[in-house]
Amino acid sequence: MQNYKYILAICLVCWYNITWSQITIQNIEIVRDAYGVPHIFGETDAEVAYGLAWAHAEDDFKTIQLAYMAGNGLLSKHKGIKAAPIDFLSQVIESQKTSDSLYNTLHPDFRKVLDGYTEGINRYAELHPNEVLEKELFPITPEKIVAYTFFQLFVSNQADDLMIAIVNDEVPVYKPVTNEDTKGSNTFAFNSVKTGEQATYLAINTHQPLDGPTSWYEAHLISKEGTNILGATFAGAPCILTGVNEYLGWSHTVNYPDKADVYSLEMHPQKKQVYVVDGKEYKLKKKKAQFYIKVLGIPVRLSKTYYTSIYGPTLKNKSGYFSVRTPTLFNIKAMEQWWRMNKAQSFTEFYNILKMNALPSYNIGYADKNDTIFYISNGRIPKRSEQYDWTKVVPGNTLKTLWTEYYQTEELPQVINPKSGFVYNANHSPFKSTSQNENPQAEAFSKTMNYELYDNNRSTRLLQLIEENSIIDYITFKKIKYDRTLPTPLAYNFVDFNALFDMKPEDYPDIEKLLTRIQLWDRTADAYSMGAGAYAVFYYIIGEYYDQLGPSKKFDPHF
């Protein structure tokens, strides 16, 4: 009998290893090129994910850990009170609970990739204990990866701004982004109609911070399961987020349709924490979020109350109870969709993957070896009632405002193979994405989607350069990519400075030389441009008086 127990124990150990570890370390090879970029080879996608985790940890284990701590309510234990709001938010939106409850909605093949990535991270941590920032974070699990992605995408939907406004006793409203002329991303693609030869060009020109959780990490992933992609990813992500394989490539820029809503609950006048929707009473679910402050370097745990309603996570301030609702709260498949995009081999396959409708937002610029170019202002956009102004607080006392459906991929602004031969985006309006007569029309889309309608300096200059050249060869393509010139007239989306160039310098003797230098400037920025330096002085000084420019935000020399 003892022999049978011994054999059974061995079988169980073998079964455990087969079931829980899909990784053969000997199959993984990490080869770094002259720039240090890891080229990671493996038999399976899971093994490549293990290698990606290892290589990224070698280069920046700290940022990966900080990212995972943020999504799993542990960042304040490491950083103290300055990270407490982040931990509070991750718990209010229930990152961990949602990732746990929805984890099995992920495809088993992608779950293997997550398993491989976590094995790589945990093995690195095991062999480098002095680099571990917070022991409680480990072991990393697939659910913890998903929880961080869930948190990150909630923030990318600008829903955190609504939460912050509620906490600060402000009226939370949709605020269009107005700084995309000072930072942002660009993408553009040309097919053979524009290149004049059998060539298709795609510019991937994303602008991310140089460090931190949203800084790019470049890698090349190759498996025998159909993965062969070179591109960039974020800390803790198990696949490439923007890049190119041997068939196609895509880039992202940030877009700004209205993806998050805030509701004012109608509270029962007598019953505590009871709200009323269409005459029916509902009880708020009261919960506690825990976070840390440090006293003499020792973490001390505190708690703060939050609630959930049928609309979503709910907070109380001096004005009442407010709920926030955004599509990322109900879906965890975004990273799986990116992984599938890594492996796409044709436009049809790529487009069908987009139909998963799991990415919460982001413009996509696309090109492939079959001369297909494509642009879409992508997103998981809710279908809302037209009778409400969704840029403001909406009533939380009716099911008419409780949206549950989303626009499908085919219903979003997009352009496929325009006759002009080009598509482009620079964080501006999706209704200005190719030649004028081929653009999507804003009137064809619900106003509740609240898509951007503006141009900016980068989009204006980009279109100028494209239209100046009937044919764009590769040399011209690169010149456009590296262009550093502002358009004439200026096209900031948040202020109009053009009157500056109409001023008469002799009328302003105190700044005559400075003004003359600005007006003679060729609007090209480089390290040796005196005009660019003079304009920068004006730009940053006038910024201090931005609120005094009036509703038009138009610069007046006499203001």
Residue ranges and their predicted role:
Residues M1-I23:
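Bacterial Sec-dependent N-terminal signal peptides
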Residues T24-P172, D368-F559:
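Long, compositionally biased non-active-site segments enriched in small/hydrophobic residues and glycine
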Residues I23-K62, D161-A426, F431-Q436:
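Internal mixed beta-strand/loop scaffold within catalytic domains of large alpha/beta enzymes
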Residues K5, W15-N17, I121, F322-T326, ...:
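Generic signature of intrinsically disordered, low-complexity, basic-rich segments
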